[in-house]
């Protein structure tokens, strides 16, 4: 059975990954202005997130606007919004399961049931980590593809924002924490040892009959 220290480390890493996923989802920095071509000298920077976009002036003033329509978002950001929300919900469920199945809690008395609950929590964290990695990698791939596409004007090219890096870090923490929790093996049932004796065959003394 995995030690309590390994279990606590797995839960801590998964919780950090969950918080990182929330931060990545909330920050409006999935795409940022690429300072190339005609954008080398500009007085403003554009941030694009899942829920809003922001314009940062050179003076430090920032104005943010929530998207008016979901259909106005690019396809990758629409998918990223859905996957990130599902990932955060799954990670929250994993945190709840890890608390229920923790060795230091008394929510479940049976040690075997506790270990199985922790394994389920680990699998949930692994799924949440994958759901964070997919939109972050997909968005990064589209940004890089458009950046090197000569048909895209420089004013529409973007660079990877901080939210993507936070998302990758959160995904790694969720995957690592989930893997550690999956190491919880249910204890084997201790069966009482029963000694079996076999009666020795007795040979009767030979009798001589007349």
Curated annotation (Swiss-Prot):
Subcellular location: Cell junction, Tight junction; Cell membrane
Post-translational events: Phosphorylated. Phosphorylation by EPHA2 is stimulated by EFNA1 and alters interaction with TJP1.
Function (record text): Can associate with other claudins to regulate tight junction structural and functional strand dynamics. May coassemble with CLDN8 into tight junction strands containing anion-selective channels that convey paracellular chloride permeability in renal collecting ducts. May integrate into CLDN3 strands to modulate localized tight junction barrier properties. May disrupt strand assembly of channel-forming CLDN2 and CLDN15 and inhibit cation conductance. Cannot form tight junction strands on its own.
Cellular component terms (Gene Ontology): bicellular tight junction; chloride channel complex; plasma membrane
Region span, Interaction with EPHA2: 1-103
Topology Cytoplasmic: residue spans: 1-7, 103-117, 182-210
Protein name as it appears in the record: Claudin-4
PANTHER family xrefs: CLAUDIN
Phosphotyrosine, modified sites: 209
Highest taxon in the source lineage: Eukaryota
Subunit structure: Can form heteropolymeric strands with other claudins. Interacts with CLDN8. Interacts with CLDN1. Directly interacts with TJP1/ZO-1. Interacts with TJP2/ZO-2 and TJP3/ZO-3. Interacts with EPHA2; phosphorylates CLDN4 and may regulate tight junctions.
Extracellular membrane side: 29-81, 139-160
Disulfide links within the chain: 54-64
GO MF annotations, alphabetized: chloride channel activity; structural molecule activity
InterPro entries per record: Claudin, Claudin4, Claudin_CS, PMP22/EMP/MP20/Claudin
Topology of the protein relative to the lipid bilayer: Multi-pass membrane protein
Organism: Canis lupus familiaris
Transmembrane domains' residue ranges: 8-28, 82-102, 118-138, 161-181
Keyword Cell membrane recorded: yes
Family as reported in the entry's similarity comment: Belongs to the claudin family.
Swiss-Prot/TrEMBL catalytic activity: chloride(in) = chloride(out); bromide(in) = bromide(out); iodide(out) = iodide(in); fluoride(in) = fluoride(out)
Region annotation Interactions with TJP1, TJP2 and TJP3: where it falls in the sequence: 209-210
């Amino acid at each position: 059975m995995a030690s309590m220290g390994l279990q606590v480390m797995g839960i801590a890493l998964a919780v950090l990954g969950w918080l990182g996923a929330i931060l990545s989802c909330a920050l409006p920095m999935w795409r940022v202005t690429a300072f190339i071509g005609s954008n080398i000298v500009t007085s403003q920077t554009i941030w694009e997130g899942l829920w809003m976009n922001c314009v940062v002036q050179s003076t430090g003033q920032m104005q943010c606007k929530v998207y008016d329509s979901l259909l106005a978002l690019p396809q990758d950001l629409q998918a990223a919004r859905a996957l990130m929300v599902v990932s955060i919900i799954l990670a929250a469920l994993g945190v709840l399961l890890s608390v229920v199945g923790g060795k230091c809690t008394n929510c479940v008395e049976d040690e075997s049931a506790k270990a199985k609950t922790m394994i389920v929590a680990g699998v949930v964290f692994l799924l949440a980590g994958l759901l964070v990695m997919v939109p972050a990698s997909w968005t990064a791939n589209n940004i890089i593809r458009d950046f090197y596409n000569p048909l895209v004007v420089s004013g529409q090219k973007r660079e990877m924002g901080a939210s993507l890096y936070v998302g990758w870090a959160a995904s790694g923490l969720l995957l690592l924490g989930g893997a550690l929790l999956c190491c919880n093996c249910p204890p084997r049932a201790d069966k009482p040892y029963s000694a079996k004796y076999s009666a020795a065959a007795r040979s009767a003394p030979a009798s001589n009959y007349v």
